[in-house]
């Protein structure tokens, strides 16, 4: 297909006051030499990278005299090998045999080497200085392999990061998991220079420990002695969910620590689990695992009442008693962390900006790339100081309120408040109900009465008067009572505007309230935690009002019209799009794509579209239909056809820019043409990324903001650490509260509207101030944030009462075999809800 090429950077931004920053990018000095690229083929294939690296290391040693001499080749763990001097093998394929001393017996591998190409670093210099149109990908890949070769041998690589268990101190998370600290490293092209991006990071790993201890952690036993009888069904299911897919090693064969992958946990204990055993006579008998271990390994099991692990391939019937297995070290946890684990993780890893800066500098000193023999072999030098870069702090927009005084708020450090201000368009609430799902003894009628009074007072002040007492206020229990109660409300009270639902902490009731309210009956619902009813604060009540007003069709505030950038001179629609994927380990659940579109000129109100699509599919499959719906809705709301479409796309990684742009830009165009054959609004396609490792720090201590010492809200960078030729920028639009702020990265993949840098940066920053759920600037533009909320809400709509709890299904991770149509129907929002911001 025809490749769309992202536009060149139009200019550099100049708006705002300048600020001196340091970025965690380290300049690389790269010689203008050629690098020699060889392809390796290792047989048997499918070895883990770690093993491949060992093979190559042995090969280089063993064939030093014949082939490698003093060269120090670097290897990517798969099939790419690079050298600084050509190998004396010409263009022919060379076949070698390499022996790895193994556990028990040696393993023999066949390796073939063949020359692929010369990678010119001169071409890279030309691209970075803008003399060549695009940066050659294979050069960056080669440099990346050089920089990673040594750390890959020393540490446990995960993606682009390296981890190692903390020396001396462990950071347990519970449930058999612990925190490992490490660092991210990637080679990035920037204007004039290659940069090494280095950041500290942390992730959850499984603790290397006996499986018996793992069981205790997962099932909350003080010790295994508490469990004298077989596991119950629910215990076994929970344990299976945690251990399935992990690697274990056996301890009962001396030095032969064979490793296996767990595919299941047996229903029967080791004393009863049988398998077909071939006897010497040739006939097979059924033998129990416990008996086999006694006869074969002279091992009397201590815990014959516990189940076995089924390992290897399902059909092979290999069973291991728990007590002879250990969890293999260095396995990253890809399953979702529990809430407790997540908060423990954040406590262990959140660092104020200055602390993080110091840690990164410390890391650079200990990594000491300039003494790395492989890096030196290729003549590369890395500066050990962070890169200085000049940023700009943009002016925040003024925020216009309504009511009598039409007050104007001016954000300071990304924050403003509603004191003495009224909603731009407040909704009068006449008919409303309360449904309390918290137990009456904990959340008493006195609590409810005082909560109602406080809420009404705050709502009056905010210009969204709740007139009169609720028409209905009853207690209820359990998710099953939601449907009948809501039906009764809808049928009994004409003109019912809102149901306030009080919840006792985490509960399946929430998912059911949203399923019934959003998709079945089309009723506006506002949930409140019991603790916020028992003791109210002006802050929580005010936040509730922000959400309620919007759900009922109100407008909380708008950008001051005369302060908006020129793009607003013609009708423009803002679209936000996101795809969310199910947590890892759920093979069957669908991905959810959401697209929202602005419905007024402020822009304040948004309309949502949502679809289920194939598991882990990154591209929005049904985008044309979704955009079409939004354009029609925009026309109905405003009586205008947008002349411009500004599309903020979240959740795309760099490797997918091309694919996503190609498919989705065409889809947006198709949506327009299908509405009217000559309808061709200008499209600007911007990818928003939060998941990257660029961190910015204030050079001047006096510029640091707040306890966490972060850069000020509005800090923008579009030089030195950004792309050499394309249109991208960093913008930190929010005030960092905890840890180190991540500036969001914006990459313009298409622009029919010919934005200047200033205009697009200011527009983006202003849109970060239009998020209705709080009176602060958020980290990404409101439309992108809303798309995320819509997809997140759809996850709740998919929760199946019969099978899942909202926290995750305890069936074997499938969407209970519901077919695509059923899932599609489940996320379809009710007609009456469609035009409201139900997701707020």
From Swiss-Prot:
The record ties this protein, via PROSITE patterns, to: PAZ, PIWI
Q: What is its main location?
A: cytoplasm
Q: Which SUPFAM superfamilies match?
A: PAZ domain (SSF101690), Ribonuclease H-like (SSF53098)
Membrane-spanning segments: none
Tell me the GO molecular function terms: endoribonuclease activity, cleaving siRNA-paired mRNA; metal ion binding; mRNA cap binding; RNA 7-methylguanosine cap binding; siRNA binding
Please state which protein family the record places this protein in: Belongs to the argonaute family. Ago subfamily.
Write down the HAMAP family for this protein, in alphabetical order.
AGO2
Domain-level remarks = The Piwi domain may perform RNA cleavage by a mechanism similar to that of RNase H. However, while RNase H utilizes a triad of Asp-Asp-Glu (DDE) for metal ion coordination, this protein appears to utilize a triad of Asp-Asp-His (DDH).
Name recorded for this polypeptide = Protein argonaute-2
**Which gene carries the instructions for this protein?**
AGO2
